[in-house]
Amino acid sequence: MRMRWLLYPRLALTNLVKNRRLTLPYLLACAGTVLMFYTMDELSINRGLSKLRDAASVQAVLFLGVLVIGIFAAIVLYYTNGFLIKGRMKELGLYSVLGMEKRHISLVLLLETLFTGLVGVGVGLALGVLFGKLMFLLLLRLLGETAALPFQVSLEALGQTCLVFACIFALILLSNLRSVKKARPMELVQAAKAGEKEPKSSAFTTVFGLLCLGGGYAIAILSKSPLDALLYFFVAVLLVIFGTHALFRSGSIALLKMLRANKRFYYRPAHFIAVSGMLYRMRKNAAGLANICILCTMVLVVVSATVSLYVGQEHALRLQHPRDVSVEIQGQAAESLEDADFYAMAQQLAAARGLALSEHAKTIAIRCYAEQRGSYFDFDGVSENVCRLYLLPLEEYVAMGGEDVALQEGEVLVFSTRSSGYGLDKVELLGGSFQVKEELAEFPIAERSDVSLETGVYLVFANRAQAELAMGGRQWEAYLYEGFNLLGEEDEKLAFSSEYCNLVNRKIDEEAEIDYAVASSIYLDGQRWQALHGGFLFLGLFLGTLFMMATVLIIYYKQVSEGLEDSARYQTMQKVGMSKREVRASIDKQIVWVFFLPLAAAVVHTMVAFPAISKMEALFFVNDMGLMLACTLATIAAFSLLYVAAYLLTARVYYRIVS
């Protein structure tokens, strides 16, 4: 009896070793997903990260990564297990024919799943513990953190990883047991060789796919604002996924049938084998090709977007901070604070830290919100095309470093933060119409870009009386801006910024009649942005690696499963007169069709999504289109090289099988 029960563990181990062509990649995938999940989970709860200045935002990004990796790991392992179990159906059927009951087969599958899980989770956790410190240091590097923070292995993360993957393997086991329980012995024997009936090209599916794909593309291209792009992007993603599956299923079949109808093309040995073989199993291939395409698109979008955010943060910071340090106050108390010498406070603090101040700018302006309708600014209809209006006298514009221009009453200088500029010859306000003497190409305390949800319009009048007259008797509040740049050591700039902003904010808090007040620094915000964008880049690279691993795994199993199905067929073709060269040519055509069409479609999806992605990145104040395009193209080039390498490696497996 004891020997009988020892038979099943031995049989399970023998099966895993004998089928190593299928089980080894699966074990590597298990170990890889465990490694990535554990690493992300360990970092998200690491006590060392809690000592960072913006630990909450970093850990929130990492926790999001834990959820995404956990869900995707379950999908990838479940999907690839389907390839694995189908390749072994004949073997399991033979066990049944030879007298093993289904409960015995189920026991073997249970033990195989247990051994696979133990090895996969064990290797993944061992690698996670081994390289955890390295990943921690990489994350700190991306976050711009130079201080040495403590790192220790988290027992909590180890336990959570074991629990999550125990659940995943339990679901996979239940799926395998269900397949065996439903099948009959001869069905198990024939399952591995079960072919697909020639699918029909459905006009409805084709039209549905075109509509979905067209709708998704339209949303991505026609979104006018960052908010529109953000709100509708995930709708576009779903439409593109549905459209991709529908068109790969029906469009590819229609194309193959068109090639088959072309007798001059079809009745050549290489074309005949490739086209007929693809058409015969197209229903299965279509789903696989669509999944590969979607995974490739996910890699390209996630990596290019996070790299763009990280690389473009310096330019984005400068758009938000025309001066290194600034104070902005709006309210009835703003004018009363004009005598509060914030600049003198800064000079004292800077001298104590060995810093110098430069490019000082200060103004008291009128700031209000209005809806722009052509040249008319409506103060009562603030709904769409919202603008922040700044009205200031010429003398203060000149004092900030602007050019001294002779302005008459009824004339204004205009600067718009919109990249296209203002573009009109007059400005109509409640107090009358004003002729635009000159549209300014630059302004001392503002930059031109489209990253903000609101356009800033600066109007320079001949004197303060003209600016107040332009309001047409409407009640307004003063706006105080004071800013300057810092010269000196970077560490001292950061320390100065923290101390100065705290002092100014405490002084401002003493005033009750203030609607808006903030003291800010490019160095403090830069530290916060580095933490947020560094966390996003780390997550993007992690997810990109995970998606790439899933892509390679699916490609590999498709090569193996198709090679096993095609082996006997190609040997038969050689026996009836086809040369090895002709067989190899037909294989090449089929492989290229199967594995490079998804890459081409993914590149198209990514480039169509680029306008929407660039608008969403504007919410993070990244608006350098040249930089974003360069990051996207570089990501496509790098991924294409990896994809070609994966294709070449897996194609060798296919050739060995069919030969």
Features from the language model and the residues they span:
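Long, hydrophobic alpha-helical segments
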Residues: 64-79, 550-551
